[in-house]
Each structure stands twice: as C-alpha cells, then as structure tokens.
Amino acid sequence: MDHWHAPYLGLRHIPPELTEFELNTFFTFSAKEHTLIEARRNHLYRLALALHLGFIRMTGRTLDAYKQVPKVLWSHLGEQLSIAPPEIGTLRSLYETRPRTLIDHQQLAQQALGFSSMTEHQRRYLVRWLKETLVGRPDPSTLLMQVKGWLYEHQILMPHDRQLKRVIAEAIRSHETFLELSLIHI
C-alpha cells in the first residue's frame, strides 16, 4: 500500500472535496468491474454499485446509504458509465424501499475487490502481529494507522475504530504481561 493512501483508510464518509487524482484512483473502473456494474438492472443501481466499489477501494470500509455523496463524484461516475448523474445527495432515497439491495451492493463490491469481514482466526493473527510490532517500540500511538494498513493489505473490511482499539489494547496487555514475566524470570 502506498503511503499517500493511509489517510483514507477507515473513513466512514466520502470527503466533500475530491480531487481529480482521488476520482481517477478510486472511482475509475477496470473492464471486469465495468462488466459487473453493467449487469445491474437500472442506471441508478449501476451508479450505486460503482460508488460502493470506489468507496471500499478508497477506505477499506463499506458505505452506508445515509452518507453524503458529492456532486462531483456523481458526475465522475456518470461520465465513467455513460449515465446522466442523479440529483440526489445520498443513497438513502435509492435504498429506502429496498434495504436488501444496499446489502447486496455492499457484498457484491467487497467480493469484486476481494475483501471480506475479519474472522476470529484473522483477529488472533492481527493480535500476534501487533505483539511483534510492539517489540522495542515504547510508543503505541501509531498502531491504529498501522492496523488499518495491515487490514487493507490483507483485504479485510475495516471494523469500527472502537473494535480496532480493543484489539490493540488486547495486544498491548499481552505484550506487557510477557515483558513482566520476562523480568520476573531474569
């Protein structure tokens, strides 16, 4: 993962001001992704699926229907898909009568990009990785960003920061216990 990508990881909303670079990097699609998008029934669902694909690629997290979508992004997606951009600010109106479609789009986007939810096995592996990362490092303040990078590189959807902080705290406690036991046995 490139260093410039780190600030986007775990965002829960689309930045209101997207640059041309961000639009092209996260919301421009491969031929395979275009095929997946074009398989949707209507224009709005095509735009919505494209939005979900780009958001996961940008943040490593799924987008809910209540977040604002900047007009510049709707325009960019419309241009990408040769569809007139909608005049809606959020996806809420699109999914209001069909909430299952939101979940379907989120799952389709994460599958297309190879992302999945964290399993218990992956959580334990993450704790073990964190304990190794803590060796010789007295300052755990950068761990949250490192965890987000690790999750993205392993194509694991970002849980809420609260859950990530609990995993970090568990790793720190385990590491401190290990250090205490090491000192006792010296």
Regions found by a protein language model. Give the residues of each.
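Charged, low-complexity surface segments at secondary-structure and domain boundaries
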Residues: 31-39, 58-63, 90-95, 111, ...
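Alpha-helical structural elements
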Residues: 21-24, 50, 69, 124, ...
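N-terminal-proximal low-complexity accessory segments that begin disordered
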Residues: 3-53
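Conserved small/polar residues in nucleotide/adenosyl-binding loops
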Residues: 184-186
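Amphipathic alpha-helical packing elements
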Residues: 40-80
